[in-house]
Design a protein with these regions (language model features):
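Alpha-helical transmembrane segments within multi-pass membrane transporters and channels
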Residues: 77-121, 127, 261-266, 296-297
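Cytosolic-side transmembrane-helix boundaries in multi-pass membrane proteins
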Residues: 2-14, 22, 100, 131, ...
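Transmembrane helix-bundle core of multi-pass membrane transporters
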Residues: 104-180, 204-207, 272, 277, ...
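Inter-helical junctions in multi-pass inner-membrane proteins, predominant
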Residues: 18-36, 156, 177-182, 208-248, ...
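Membrane-interfacial amphipathic/re-entrant helices at transmembrane-helix boundaries
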Residues: 1-39, 68, 79-82, 108-113, ...
Length: 308
């Protein structure tokens, strides 16, 4: 009880010393962090929603995206070129992984692809360590995106605003693709009932291939965007993977809309907790997940019994 009282007094003291502007800036920082979570989680949800594959290698694709960007820049490329090249290259790698490793495991239950991608993630991380070393590298923010901009409540890093904007563009493009194209219609129908899609004469294996490629491409893009914020290290994918699984569980397994809402919510919760109680920042993610699962076990937009 005494410790709880001391903790409450410390928290009250911190809150008393905070201005509205500082809280608002921290909220924007949470949105920028949440944007990275969103990009990572929508790829994870897209793959699970269509393929029913829990891709434990998703964090490794995220990490590869950061390293590919770093390598391209070392060859004389620039960040703007990387924004296009990285998702393309990582997506092509994802296509190869699906075609060669994952496709033979379809129809064998959820466990086999899970174990395979779990092992694949370790292989990918070790390959990066052998190729680039165990230590990390800084990733310079593009010169045009350095500095801060006045957003009314204070100055906010321009690059973080760019991350929020880039995420919004990707979400819009993905929505247009899924809602306004015939292939997007097939993907949405296949996520609900693959058998119906097969009856219509659609090559489901080709659809799964493209979906896996898109999901991994988005993960690589997220890794590239995160690189200037946190640097590039082989373990960066494992860190976000645990947090992103919380996002997908809270949002609902396989739900892209849920991943967007939950990603932003988790980012804001982590950011605000870091302001008021820094030692509880990481714990707050799992506390949020526990609360959501108690109230709604399938998450915000998940379907009951999806994992059965």
């Amino acid at each position: 009880m005494a410790r709880a009282a001391v903790g409450a007094r410390k928290l009250g003291g911190r809150m008393a010393g905070l201005s509205f502007d500082l809280i608002a800036l921290q909220l924007f920082a949470g949105l920028a962090l949440g944007a990275i979570y969103v990009l990572f989680a929508i790829g994870l949800s897209l793959i699970f929603g269509m393929l029913t594959v829990v891709n434990f290698a998703h964090g490794a694709f995220y990490m590869v995206g950061a390293y590919v960007g770093l390598y391209l820049i070392s060859l004389g490329g620039n960040f703007w070129l990387c924004l296009v090249a990285v998702p393309l290259l990582v997506g092509l790698f994802g296509l190869a992984v699906e075609r060669v490793l994952i496709r033979p495991l379809y129809g064998r239950g959820i466990d086999y692809p899970l174990l395979l991608t779990f092992g694949l993630s370790y292989v990918m991380v070790e390959c990066v360590r052998i190729s680039f070393g165990k230590t990390g590298y800084p990733f310079d923010t593009p010169e045009v995106l350095q500095g801060a901009v006045d957003i009314g409540v204070g100055y906010f890093p321009l690059y973080r605003l760019f991350v929020i904007g880039a995420t919004a563009v990707v979400l819009l493009a993905l929505w247009l693709f899924l809602e306004k194209t015939s292939f997007g219609l097939i993907i949405r129908a296949g996520a609900r009932d693959p058998q119906i899609v097969r009856v219509l004469g659609v090559d489901v294996s080709r659809v799964w291939l493209i979906v896996f490629g898109i999901g991994t491409a988005i993960a690589g893009f997220a890794g590239l965007l995160a690189a200037p914020l946190q640097g590039v290290i082989p373990e960066m994918g494992g860190t976000i993977l645990a947090e992103a699984f919380v996002v997908t569980v809270v949002g609902g397994m396989g739900s892209i809309g849920g991943a967007v809402l939950a990603g932003l919510l988790v980012g804001v919760v982590v950011s605000m907790t870091s302001l008021f109680a820094p030692e509880m920042a990481k714990v707050s993610i799992f506390a949020l997940m526990a609360i959501v699962l108690i109230i709604r076990p399938q998450g915000f937009f998940g379907r009951a019994g999806l994992m059965s």
